[in-house]
């Protein structure tokens, strides 16, 4: 039987790798683009026809005419934020209602989830994990404890269900001694978002996706955040509340592992992280500041300043392993265009002096061991072929490929979709 394939696109670092742009480059090859986890805490930034967009919940394939986009069961959805995002796209002339399907099994982020998020974070004192405050963690907590509200719930007796969940949350918030909140206005907008959601096609997305595959069509699964924020395999507890790795696509969309084809792993030519948590190659000097300025490293949703550092190949090798990456995509190579010297971490030195190339359970106190490369000192942003790459950049690419035992198939040399080199 001639069935379609499911390819997965995901970040290999701590998020913000540039997944949105790459999805936009890859989407012409696929019939359906599906988001499989996460919520509005992660923003995909794309530039399309000279205009910048930040997508928080809607799959990046929405800019491609004729493509079906699916928000899968693994996603947590905030109706008010979704409504704002969707209406902004509609104002720009993008048709959503006929091409965007939403899983009935996706969980809803309630206004009280956001208050709970703030209350729980405040109660941690110095041990805060750096939440975005969007209510993601408490929503996934309700999901796992089997007490959450789902998109499908809005179709029948919703108000009673909502009030029961709200009352439960308010008790939890009171028990934490948190009083600094008023959800009146937010709740009003949230309910408007619920009515707006009803205008979209709510589906059993796992059934729809498998029908698409049986008809011979191909699907691109889009992850949010990055591998190192995975709740199981990331730098716990400084992680998100969902599985961001390739296996999460099967769970978050309802497809069998045998349906997975290519796994595209996205990495920056350097590395960034937002919020607290270990970051072995972080730079605290003027080099880190230069990377931040040249790369415009500020959160798409929060505006938070990102921590910047050199590329960590030990961490990336781990990410390639747990995801089964078949092809690498290197983003923001142009940010390093003006550096005299470029470094990449090739090993960790542990507290006892041992040197290892394994990414371990505890990376708080490791010291990075670097390999230095001569910078290419060339503006690559106007290049149209890999043949134009300077030798120094070719050497850097070759070393990364050799270390990770995986080919780099696509290289981004600027923010625009046209500034993308697909290698031979």
Give the residues covered by each predicted segment.
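Non-transmembrane, aqueous-exposed alpha-helical and coiled segments at domain scale
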Residues: 1-424
């Amino acid at each position: 039987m001639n069935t379609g394939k499911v390819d997965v696109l995901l970040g290999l670092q701590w998020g913000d790798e540039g997944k949105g742009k790459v999805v936009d480059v890859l989407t012409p090859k696929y019939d359906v683009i599906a988001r499989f986890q996460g919520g509005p805490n992660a923003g995909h930034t794309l530039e399309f026809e000279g205009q910048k967009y930040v997508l928080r919940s809607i799959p990046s394939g929405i800019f491609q005419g004729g493509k079906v986009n699916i928000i899968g069961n693994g996603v947590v959805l905030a109706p008010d934020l979704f409504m704002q995002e969707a209406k902004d796209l509609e104002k720009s002339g993008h048709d959503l209602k006929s091409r965007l399907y939403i899983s009935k099994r996706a969980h809803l982020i309630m206004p009280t989830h956001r208050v709970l998020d703030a209350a729980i974070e405040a109660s941690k004192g110095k041990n805060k994990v750096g939440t975005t405050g969007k209510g993601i963690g408490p929503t996934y907590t309700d999901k796992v404890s089997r007490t959450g509200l789902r998109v499908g719930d809005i179709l029948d007796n919703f108000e009673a269900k909502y009030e029961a969940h709200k009352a439960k949350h308010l008790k939890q918030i009171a028990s934490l001694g948190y009083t600094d909140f008023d959800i009146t206005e937010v709740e009003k907008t949230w309910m408007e978002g619920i009515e707006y959601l009803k205008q979209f096609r709510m589906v059993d997305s796992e059934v729809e996706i498998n029908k698409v595959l049986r008809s011979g069509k191909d699907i691109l699964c889009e992850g949010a955040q990055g591998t190192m924020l995975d709740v199981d395999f990331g730098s716990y507890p400084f992680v998100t509340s969902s599985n961001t790795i390739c296996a999460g696509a099967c769970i978050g969309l309802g497809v069998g592992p045998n349906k997975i084809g290519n796994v595209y792993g996205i990495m920056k030519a350097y590395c960034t992280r937002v919020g607290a948590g270990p970051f072995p190659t972080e730079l605290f000097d003027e080099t880190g500041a230069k990377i931040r300025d040249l790369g415009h490293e500020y959160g798409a949703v929060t505006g938070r300043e990102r921590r910047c550092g050199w590329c960590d190949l030990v961490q990336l090798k781990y990410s390639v392993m747990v995801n089964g990456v078949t092809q690498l995509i290197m983003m923001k190579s142009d940010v390093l265009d003006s550096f005299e010297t470029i470094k990449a971490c090739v090993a960790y030195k542990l507290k006892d002096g041992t040197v290892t190339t394994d990414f371990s359970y505890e990376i708080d106190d490791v010291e990075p061991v670097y390999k230095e490369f001569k910078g290419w000192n060339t503006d690559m942003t106007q290049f149209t072929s890999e043949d134009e790459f300077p030798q120094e950049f070719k050497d850097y690419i070759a070393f990364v490929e050799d270390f990770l035992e995986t080919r780099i198939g696509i290289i981004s040399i600027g923010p625009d979709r046209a500034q993308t080199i697909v290698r031979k």
